[in-house]
């Protein structure tokens, strides 16, 4: 599996999608539930394919727009991610982290299939502990009262 920064949609359809479908079906058969996944980079051209393949959730890299994802396939797939791991989590301030978390919750917290606040990719080495703690603080405060299809109470109450 790879992003549209590396291969074309046609190549994805030929070389990745059939195997993604097999992995999803196999995981569901063995584990009893469908998996989630993350693909680094640009993925918007394949969101519908991933939803059609039966992916339970998809972690969106921070280079993509959560509002667009929600609008295009939010009724078919749960999303996670999108807080920038380098610009915000590693290099940003505590306030930057809190604002990025709030922004993601505002954009996708009411996704019909759900949203999991997370970073757009894994945290880089050297990410300050204070920023991880700020992320946890923001998730607890602003993600409070989360329900499918509704903005969390923490966002609504500010």
Regions inferred by a protein language model and the residue ranges of each:
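Active-site loop segments of alpha/beta catalytic cores
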Residues: 1-158
């Amino acid at each position: 599996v790879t992003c549209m920064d590396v291969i074309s949609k046609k190549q994805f359809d030929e070389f990745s999608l059939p195997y993604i479908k097999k992995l999803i079906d196999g995981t569901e058969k063995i584990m009893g539930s469908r998996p989630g996944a993350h693909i680094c980079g640009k993925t918007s051209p394949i969101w519908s394919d991933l939803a059609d393949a039966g992916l339970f959730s998809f972690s969106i890299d921070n280079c993509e727009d959560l509002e667009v994802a929600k609008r295009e396939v939010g009724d078919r797939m749960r999303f996670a991610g999108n807080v920038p791991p380098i610009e915000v989590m590693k290099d940003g301030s505590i306030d930057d982290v809190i604002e990025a978390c709030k922004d993601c919750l505002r954009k996708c917290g009411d996704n019909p299939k759900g949203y999991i606040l997370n970073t757009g990719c894994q945290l880089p080495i050297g990410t300050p502990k204070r920023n991880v703690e700020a992320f946890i603080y923001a998730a607890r405060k602003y993600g409070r009262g989360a329900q499918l299809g509704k903005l969390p109470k923490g966002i609504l109450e500010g």
